[in-house]
UniProtKB/Swiss-Prot annotation:
Protein name, UniProt field: Beta-ketoacyl-[acyl-carrier-protein] synthase III
Cysteines paired by S-S bonds: none
Annotated region (ACP-binding), positions in chain: 257-261
UniProt pathway: Lipid metabolism; fatty acid biosynthesis
Oligomer status and interactors: Homodimer.
InterPro entries: ACP_syn_III_C, ACP_syn_III_N, FabH, Thiolase-like
Subcellular location: Cytoplasm
Function: Catalyzes the condensation reaction of fatty acid synthesis by the addition to an acyl acceptor of two carbons from malonyl-ACP. Catalyzes the first condensation reaction which initiates fatty acid synthesis and may therefore play a role in governing the total rate of fatty acid production. Possesses both acetoacetyl-ACP synthase and acetyl transacylase activities. Its substrate specificity determines the biosynthesis of branched-chain and/or straight-chain of fatty acids.
GO biological process terms on file: fatty acid biosynthetic process
Domain-level remarks: The last Arg residue of the ACP-binding site is essential for the weak association between ACP/AcpP and FabH.
Keyword Lipoprotein tagged: no
Annotated PANTHER family: 3-OXOACYL-[ACYL-CARRIER-PROTEIN] SYNTHASE, BETA-KETOACYL-[ACYL-CARRIER-PROTEIN] SYNTHASE III, CHLOROPLASTIC
Gene: fabH
Length: 331
């Protein structure tokens, strides 16, 4: 009987733009304060991409670092998945642009649009291709340039988001390690709570849509907050049960970096100590699909994750969507 192929993470990488926008900078732009932002979100600063940088540029840099960490060449890749809500353009996909940038011409390439849940969705997709034996090396990227779709006059949203990219190479690992399970979900009835109205077939771009700022993020903050608190709980418990694990088995929780109050509520329900929860939103804000990918790479490179550790990732996002995964670290 053939032994089941285990799919895990071979390498990680991340990239953050150089420009830092602090809460004090935002005080000069909109009616807000450092105290207000910090108290309600935990965010102190965020990174902003240069006007010349597109999402694919950030994704490419993160990918190079992930490939180096995995000791692989671009031509070793069989597939590239980019999770983003800020693609370079409607088509071709940002993944195809990254493929060309890397010279990974043996790889299939496509984008997924799952909001902040995108990177974990991508890991789950990659896991299936590797475990079935169809592909050996799949590059999963979460990348965003949210600064380009923010209404900088809307103090309720412009303080929340930042730019960045994270990447992971998913491939074969030793039996018993790797991605142990995933849980993905969606509730399309909540799509109205977090969306960008214009630019698609429902509302094509026009002078009117531009003048009305309809190419920017619209969010019902309270509705998203209530959804997030509920789903962070259910998604973590569900994926742990699927893997036959309990909260006591978690060595590191890597949550979507949206709001410290949401993360703290999840930490308390799981009864985890602070050192078992990785948080970097104070530095980067909410980077949507890049959030979990960047945090995972940072935690690994800081030595906070070691071989055999049980890593729980969880996210929620536009759609509305949610995703969680359990990884037994193999590096």
């Amino acid at each position: 009987m053939c032994e089941k192929i285990a799919a895990g993470i071979l390498g990680t990488g991340s990239y953050l733009p150089e420009k830092i926008l602090t809460n004090f900078d935002l005080e000069k732009m909109v009616d807000t304060s450092d105290e207000w932002i910090t108290t309600r979100t935990g965010i102190k600063e965020r990174r902003i991409a240069d006007p010349s940088q597109a999402t694919s540029d950030l994704a490419t840099e993160a990918s190079k670092r992930a490939l180096e960490d995995a000791n692989l060449k671009p031509e070793d890749l069989d597939m590239i998945i980019v999770a983003t809500v800020t693609p370079d353009m409607n088509f071709p996909s940002t993944a195809c642009i990254v493929q060309a940038n890397l010279g990974a011409l043996n790889a299939a390439a496509f984008d997924i649009s799952v909001g902040c849940s995108g990177f974990i969705y991508g890991l789950a997709i990659a896991q299936q291709f590797v475990e079935t034996g169809m592909y050996r090396n799949v590059l999963v990227i979460g990348a965003e340039t949210l600064s380009k779709i923010i209404n900088w006059k809307d103090r309720n949203t412009c303080v929340l988001f930042g730019d960045g990219a994270g990447a992971a190479v998913v491939g074969r690992v030793e039996s018993g390690y790797g991605i142990l399970g995933s849980y993905l979900g969606a509730d399309g009835t909540g799509g109205k709570y977090l969306y960008m109205p214009a630019g698609g077939s429902r509302m094509p771009a026009s002078h009117e849509t531009v003048e009305k700022n309809l190419h920017t993020i619209f969010m019902e903050g309270q509705e998203v907050f209530k959804f997030a608190v509920k789903v962070m709980d259910s998604a973590t418990i569900e994926v742990l049960e699927r893997c036959g694990l309990t909260p006591e088995d978690i060595d590191m929780l890597i949550p979507h970096q949206a709001n410290t109050r949401i993360i703290e509520a999840a930490r308390k329900r799981l009864k985890l100590t602070n050192d078992k929860v990785y948080i970097n939103l104070d530095k980067y804000g909410n980077t949507s699909a890049a959030s979990v990918a960047i945090a995972l790479d940072e935690a690994y490179r800081k030595g906070l994750i070691k071989k055999g550790d049980i890593i729980l990732t969880v996210a929620f996002g536009a759609g509305l969507t949610w995703a969680s995964s359990v990884i037994k670290w193999s590096k």
